[in-house]
Amino acid sequence: MSSQIQSVHTPSVSLSKYRDQHFKGSRHEQEKLLRVSSTLYVGNLSFYTTEEQIHELFSRCGDVRRIIMGLDKFKKTPCGFCFVEYYSRLDAESAMRYINGTRLDDRIVRVDWDAGFIEGRQYGRGKTGGQVRDEYRQDHDLGRGGYGKMVQMGQLGAPSMRE
């Protein structure tokens, strides 16, 4: 009977292939934590999305314990991600199933399992303080501060307009 219950997992709540490269522990320990975690990583947020908006959306799937906004490590301003902790794994699974891939603030959000929030992880890991993915981005994205940081600093050229 228990083997039938274990096979109920759908791909939408399965573990992704992504693993936090800064995890303090072995790959096996990280896998073990991911399987029981009730913490989610939420990415591709607008820099202007508020904690209240996130709470309103994610509380539709269950009781939210806390939300930790991702911050630029130098400016302490939102930088496009957060962690959402639920009281139960089942509520977190509901969020994975129903919220991943939906729109919030005109952006398609990515929701993934997280091994659990540790103080310090709320800060962006990019050289300029934000997320690494925003450093070299050459497209103009108003929801994420315009061009990527390297373009804004003149270290990469902005894409030219073709006629």
UniProtKB/Swiss-Prot annotation:
Return the Gene3D superfamilies for the record: 3.30.70.330
InterPro entries, per the entry: NCBP2, NCBP2_RRM, Nucleotide-bd_a/b_plait_sf, RBD_domain_sf, RRM_dom
Q: Which terms in the Gene Ontology molecular function aspect does this entry carry?
A: RNA cap binding
Q: Which intervals hold domain RRM? A: 38-116
Amino-acid positions noted as binding mRNA in the UniProt annotation, renumbered to this chain = 18, 41, 110-114, 121-125, 131-132
Q: Name one GO biological process term.
A: mRNA cis splicing, via spliceosome
Q: Name one GO cellular component term.
A: nuclear cap binding complex
User: In which domain of life is the source organism classified?
Assistant: Eukaryota
Which of UniProt's keywords are assigned here? mRNA processing, mRNA splicing, Nucleus, RNA-binding, RNA-mediated gene silencing
Q: Where in the cell is it found?
A: Nucleus
Q: Which residues form the signal peptide?
A: none
For this UniProt entry, what is the primary localization, expressed as one broad class? nucleus
* One Pfam family hit: RRM_1
Among PANTHER family, the record links this protein to: 20 KD NUCLEAR CAP BINDING PROTEIN (PTHR18847), NUCLEAR CAP-BINDING PROTEIN SUBUNIT 2 (PTHR18847:SF0)
Self-association or partners: how does it assemble? Component of the nuclear cap-binding complex (CBC), a heterodimer composed of Cbp80 and Cbp20 that interacts with m7GpppG-capped RNA.
The job of this chain, per UniProt, is described as: Component of the cap-binding complex (CBC), which binds co-transcriptionally to the 5' cap of pre-mRNAs and is involved in various processes such as pre-mRNA splicing and RNA-mediated gene silencing (RNAi). The CBC complex is involved in miRNA-mediated RNA interference and is required for primary microRNAs (miRNAs) processing. Also involved in innate immunity via the short interfering RNAs (siRNAs) processing machinery by restricting the viral RNA production.
**Family classification:** Belongs to the RRM NCBP2 family.
Q: What is this protein called?
A: Nuclear cap-binding protein subunit 2
> What is the native source organism of this protein?
Anopheles gambiae
Q: What is the lineage of its organism?
A: Eukaryota, Metazoa, Ecdysozoa, Arthropoda, Hexapoda
Tell me the name of the encoding gene: Cbp20
